[in-house]
Amino acid sequence: MIRLYDFGIWLYGFGLWLASFFDKKAKLWVLGRQDIFSNISSQITDNQPTVWFHCASLGEFEQGRPLIEKIKKDLPDYKIFLTFFSPSGLEIRKNYKYADHIFYLPLDTTKNAKQFLKIVQPQIVFFVKYEFWYNYLKQLNQEKIPTYLVSSIFREDQIFFKPYGSFFKKMLFFFDHIFVQNEYSKSILLENKVSHVSVAGDTRVDRVLEIQKNKRSFDEIIFFKGNTEILIGGSTWPSEEDILIKWIYTQNDLHWKFIIAPHDISEHRLLEIEKKLNVNSVRFSKANALNSAAAKVMIIDNIGMLSSLYQYGKIALIGGGFGNGIHNTLEPITFGLPVIFGEKYQKFEEANKLVETGGGYSIKNYDEFNYIMKSLENDDFYNNASTNAEKYVLKNQGATMKIFDFIFKGK
């Protein structure tokens, strides 16, 4: 099986190399790994103890981030070595100030794993949520380097628990401890004789509470909002935008305004959104006191401000639920916003709980969206939804401290 796995890894790398000739993201993936070991070696100039964090992309980074910053604050002698698998993580966070070194993870081969660990020499290793790389985990286990999986979620239908999944299940035993988000994940692992597990929760909750505490203010949004209510489309794709824009057409009064923060902020996508709108709109980058106040829709054409924008909102429509899975719902509910999203939310613990408690609503189409919006116009219905949304965050804080104390204080 290991030969088949290694061949699959090689084939994946070769496929990305071919794709790099015509795909920008694949090109970044390939170029970021050129001469990577010499680049890493040139940066490591001392023997200061190192903690290695590995994240697939930006979402996983946000889950690891609270723990990184806790270690930096309480254990400043440790250096943080941060790796990403995807360009969508590294390219956005390559200047992250709490990491001493930031690189792409070299392809998961036995040779690469040995060379990487020989150069980096981590004392402690954290893999975040869904990252399972056999050769790295096996080498870490053989070298007896403490390795932890944090903010993970497990389901019965995952390959680890299939009759043919023994090779992948073996990776779970390479971790010294697994911190899961919920009791269900723990029970699945225990049923499969993986006993080195505990429920810590989702570290992202601690992160969004920190964002709420230190939220940024934007004069442009204040001018834009005035005395209206704002419906925010967060990390939207065309499917959500079509629903939102259709609803905008029905709002002829001055009660509502709208913020659209698309997942893709390329010029092509921004123009596409503007073309669909038949109302006065303004991009954030071009906003001023005059045109903000006059606009019905503001389009966010940058990355990084959405998490603070939710403070101005009343309701949030979250993108991704009609595609591969919803984007961040924790950021809006921290500010007490009820959230609406598409059908594909089941892999996200917080979304499941929000639907159960009435703080979040899943929709299949425009008619269902319209029904939820009409329901939320009722003050009692809205206040109940807002309270339930905010309760989830307050109830589930503290995962970062649980993990930190377990590893560094032996609690």
Annotated model-derived regions:
Residues R3-W17, F21:
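Low-complexity, intrinsically disordered, cysteine-poor segments enriched in small/polar
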Residues W17-N214, I232, T236-P238, Q251, ...:
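Active-site and donor-binding regions of nucleotide-sugar-utilizing enzymes
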Residues E60-D74, K213-A287:
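Conserved catalytic-core segment of nucleotide-activated headgroup transferases in glycan assembly
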Residues R93, K97-I102, L271-I300:
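Nucleotide-activated donor-binding/catalytic signature segment of Leloir-type glycosyltransferases, i.e.
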Residues I145-T147, F258, S281, V339:
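Hydrophobic beta-strand scaffold residues
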Residues F175, E191, L306-K391:
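Catalytic binding pocket for nucleotide-activated donors in carbohydrate/polymer assembly enzymes
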Residues R204, V282-N324, T329:
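Donor nucleotide-activated moiety binding/catalytic core segment of transferases
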Residues N396-K411:
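C-terminal alpha-helical cap of glycosyltransferases
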